[in-house]
Each structure stands twice: as C-alpha cells, then as structure tokens.
C-alpha cells in the first residue's frame, strides 16, 4: 500500500485533495508510486478518528483503472459490442438492454459490477447493480477465454451485485462465469420467442439462485448443457 497526503481545499469545506503518481509496471512497495495494470481495482480509504460530531468516520471509494464505465441508468439501443480490448466494463448500477436491441459480449471480456451499488433504485434488487435484458443478450466466450460477470470487491462475497435478468428478452451464454451475485441468471416472463441457453459455463457462489426461469407462459425453450452450477444455496436451477 502507498500513502497519499490529503489537504483540505479551503477552511471547513470538507473537500480534501491529494495525488499520487501512477505507472503501468510491476509492484514496488514504498516507492511513492502506484503500480497498476488495466482492470486493477483501486480502493481509497479515509479515516477520521473524530468527525463533525466527535465520532469516528470512515470513507471508502472504489474505481477500476483503465475500465469502460457503464453508469447506472444506461439504456443500450441498437446493436452494441463489448470486447476484451475495450474492457473491463464496470457497471455502477442497473443497465437495460432495450427491446429490439442486441448486446453481444465477446470472449475474454470481464464485466464487473460495483458491489452494493445502484442509484436507480430499480430492477429486481433495488440496491444492487443488475443487467436487465428486454432485447437480446449474446455472450460468446471460449474455453481459453471465458466471459466473466463478477463483483468489484477484492474479497467478494455472494450477493455483491444483483444478477442478469431476462425480462421477456432472450439470452445465450457460452463459456461464461457468473459469480457473487444474488440470483445469477434469471428468466422472467419468457415465452416461445425468448429462448435462454446456457452452455459450457460456470454459475457459482451466488447468494440465492444459479439459474431461474419463472412467470412465463410455459412455452419458453430453456437449454442448460455442460454447465457447472455450484454453491447457490437456495437452488442451483429453479
């Protein structure tokens, strides 16, 4: 860890500023520089033993170095491609793939959800980031380079983020890892025109469910093949 000196911007402003030099290199401890690489998680802690009311206060702020940030409330329209060379992608709250739109995610891409964060207060989980799909989601990983959907935390736990919800939209997942969410992959209100396919993937360490399909009319085609579903305490498949 490196230390940064913070200076208040003015008298009683409550705004503190500081800086540290960063370089893309191997870690060297205590050299006054922060060595980083693309996708590294940067976390800043500020602790005040006596805040405004005499009580100890602490502030934590987290960001990803060289990440594509997809902000809470983003709506994806038309055809959109996410790829490893433009990633990782940091989702800070609920994101919607609109009806008629297609989001394609290519092999090796990391999609990271900011833990316990959602300013939209919407979706299935009001206080956690989710990827909601009313259009089409195609996730095409490979055995050598799967697509990862995971938490922003360095020490992640189940329930850090909401999950991937197909709200009457279709979803195809091949060589995908979904971990540390609340409900994993959730098909809601699907019918015969909204297939959900999960192949050669890993669904693990989610708080409640691994893969769910409910509230449809019974005609939806759901295919799960060659997939490891483990440590999803309520149900692996529901």
Question: What name fits each language-model region?
Answer:
Residues 1-5, 10:
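Extended low-complexity, serine/threonine- and proline-enriched intrinsically disordered segments
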Residues 9-35:
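Aromatic sugar-binding surface patches on proteins
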Residues 52-68:
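Short beta-strand elements
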Residues 31, 65-238:
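Beta-strand/loop edge motif enriched in small/polar residues
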Residues 7, 43-46, 59:
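Anionic, low-complexity intrinsically disordered segments
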Residues 32-49:
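Short, aromatic- and glycine-rich surface loops/edge beta-strands on solvent-exposed regions
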